[in-house]
Amino acid sequence: MNNIKKDSQKDRPTYKDTLNLLQTNFGMRANATLREPELQAFWREKNIDFELGLNNSGETFTLHDGPPYANGTLHMGHALNKVLKDIINKFQTMKGKKVCYVPGWDCHGLPIELKVLQAMDKSQRAELTPIKLRKKAAAYAKKQVSQQMDGFKRWGVWGDWDQPYLSLDKKFEASQIKLFGEMVFKGYIYRGLKPVHWSPSSQTALAEAELEYPTGHTSKSIYVGFKVNQIPKRLTQEISKQAPDLINSEGKLKELKLVIWTTTPWTIPANEAISVNQKLEYVIAQSSDRSLIIIANDLLQEVSKSVGINYEKRVLIKGSILDGIIYKHPLFDKISPVVLGGDYITTESGTGLVHTAPGHGVDDFNTAKKYNLSISCPVDEKGFLTKEAGKFEGLNVLKDANSVIISDLINAGSLLKEIPYEHRYPYDWRTKKPTIFRATEQWFASVEGFRDKALSAIEDVIWLPESGKNRINSMVRERGDWCISRQRTWGVPIPVFYEKNGQEILLNKETISHIADLFSVHGADIWWEYEVSELLPPSYLNQADRWQKGTDTMDVWFDSGSSWSSVISKKENLNYPADLYLEGSDQHRGWFQSSLLTSVAVNEHAPFKKVLTHGFALDENGRKMSKSLGNIIDPLVIINGGSNKKLDPAYGADVLRLWVSSVDYSADVPIGSNILKQISDVYRKVRNTSRYLLGNLYDFDYKIDSIDIANLPLLDKWMLNRTAEVIDEISDAYNNFEFSKFFQTIQNFCVVDLSNFYLDIAKDRLYVSSKSDFRRRSCQTVLSLVIEKISGLIAPVLCHMAEDIWQNIPYDLEEASVFQRGWPNVPKSWKNSSFNCHVTELRKLRAVINRMLESCRNNQALGSSLEASVRVDISDEKVKAAIEWLAESESNNVDVLRDWFLVSSLQIGGEPWAEVLVSEDNDYASVEIAKARGFKCERCWHYEIEMSKNPQHTNICKRCEKVVLAI
């Protein structure tokens, strides 16, 4: 009785201190900016964040990290990628797999080189040597790696942070040289003159993966007439047959022009031929002023409309008959032939006649090789026309050359029309400036040599989503040889020596092996630091004066594409092929492809068993994030908050991680303040549900106080069965990388199954019962089992919350960390699906009653649902069976229908009531709600007819009297 306090105003007992109210240190608020770093420090201290996965005894699971570029601050794309990987790794770790996640960084390439140059003034640049540039670039890259690494750690990402792989590491560079050598020995590497994507802004060749195609590019497209100088006999015969009036009395044809269409007027000076498709039909057409042109038959009408001239068909001929026409260049005193090209010449656009500049297009180049044409390429590395372009020397092909050349074509009477043309055009992905095709001597990987093997290897890989297989298949099937050389300083050098006074190249097993050994000890800088004599193997020292070092470096995609060779095939506890590669969908043409090609070339199989791709992070309106739009979402601001905490609150890393789990990452995913609020609400619901469970366990020790599963009430057994179902559902979601299903399932479980149903019913058991009452201990047994499972289920995603829950479980646990417990298992004793049909029917009836009670509350007829009495007439057999099933266990004082419905009294059947607040008839029941009779118990709030007879406790019910008197 000493625990009973009195209300000073009413001078009667208050019973708050007799209730079993929540007690836990697990806060309602996460306080993530302080708590999450504390939990991360705990993981490090206990060697959980990396050693746990490494020390597991299960089979090895390897997710090989695609290296992000060591430049710039972390963005939402990084967050999406790294958190997805971490969710998978944590899940596999908890399943007992041996997980060794080695994070990596791509450290070479132009952007870093440009950052170094931008930080220097003109005088510093003038004194800059290649080796000084490389030293500065390496220092910059390492600084960026350190900053990005700190960000990844703050997100809760686990990995071997003490030994990441960097493409600038000595061992990595040496391994890359060895891989290059193996491809050389297999005959897959060659040097040749070919048109390649060239970036005048970067002054280097580019691979397809280094290009982007922004919208809105407009070119000056032109229709040009090339005057025919001589026609073959077969064509003359066809004209004589079909339109003899076109030939004059001297047997000569009136002036005839070949019409081409191009979007690169600056290439006209490099014209060496006009190509036609021998299978297409062409026409000689005549305008009203009697001028004649040759054009593809299917394009005549479209071209006539474009140039504004009406043409009449006069002669219909096959493309093969045009072979051998000789025409005059419109700007130079030069004649060239019409040749037969290939199927690349179509009638989808243009004129069906292709202006062929062999130095500026792959098809043009191949046609030129076929006909032994000159490979003219009058453009230098900066994009300026050279002496070969005659009077156009010095003009920039991307600036003033087009206008000047078009003007000269007008003056020559050769321009039919100039039309602005918006189309996809390749830009340098680093400088964001246009590129050109330019024929230069480059090093190539001969994809043609192992294309079929690569296509076969693609079939052996599981691609998620499946559309990824078709995408990379078409890319590999259609791609040309891979240009792997770059004219830059910051990269891994191509280890080749060129003869000073000849054409020989020194590149063999001995030289490559020697260079690789040197790099493994000293790093690639020695290529610039050492003399040739110091780089050549001993057997070549007497030839040092004969050779000079090459200056090209390797494509950065070759760097990252060789990571399988230097990381997963070399280090312990890693699988090659890797179990999984996971990157953005743009990597089908990037890292996935470069890794595939190098691995297939050397080992004839892919470096991965499974490939999973994700989309890009967009703003809430589906727009790409950019500074100009002002819509960039910073992961750091999500975690720590912005300068204005009301606008940008500090959500913590777990909310960021929960967002990742919530999205359909197979497509582009939106993120913004409204979405973050929604995710934060879900986070809060999971947290508050967990807090409620923990708060009701403050006096519970599972080893001492738990009730045997077999003796639990039906409600509790159903709750364990439902938990078992959720474990299976979430396990499947993780196994299938369907993390949004985890998000939906855990949210539904916490809100619908726990908060709105089981815990709603359990409040009376937990708060009002005596501490050791069966009603309470049975519920606490379930709460303890469920909270341990919830902690495990959310751990891969909400790793900080999961660990915080675990550390706040009030009884002793064998494991210090939830991650040491492992993945939640499902005891057989929990499973009993026969409960589901009965509980489903009762929940359906409960929902009807709740809706009716809510109506009464809205009308202010009722306050708490305990102020109500309910009468139910059951017409549905399933509902009747469910009520009978529950009634069999009423003696445990838990499985009581009025408690399930949270009302003070419930009557099944009987006469309709005279006074009701609301009633409803439906297909399965007739329900009436009236005000409860009796008196309100001040302790449990139930309305009872009989109250305590104890003069000190007349305002509580008999049930509560027993509890209070026993305290």
UniProtKB/Swiss-Prot annotation:
Gene Ontology biological process terms in this record: isoleucyl-tRNA aminoacylation
Coiled-coil region: none
Residues involved in ATP binding: 627
Localization terms from the record: Cytoplasm
SUPFAM superfamilies per the UniProt record, alphabetical: Anticodon-binding domain of a subclass of class I aminoacyl-tRNA synthetases, Nucleotidylyl transferase, ValRS/IleRS/LeuRS editing domain
Residues where Zn(2+) binds: 937, 940, 957, 960
Positions contributing to L-isoleucyl-5'-AMP binding: 583
Summary of subunit composition and partner proteins: Monomer.
Function: Catalyzes the attachment of isoleucine to tRNA(Ile). As IleRS can inadvertently accommodate and process structurally similar amino acids such as valine, to avoid such errors it has two additional distinct tRNA(Ile)-dependent editing activities. One activity is designated as 'pretransfer' editing and involves the hydrolysis of activated Val-AMP. The other activity is designated 'posttransfer' editing and involves deacylation of mischarged Val-tRNA(Ile).
Protein name per the record: Isoleucine--tRNA ligase
Gene name in the database record: ileS
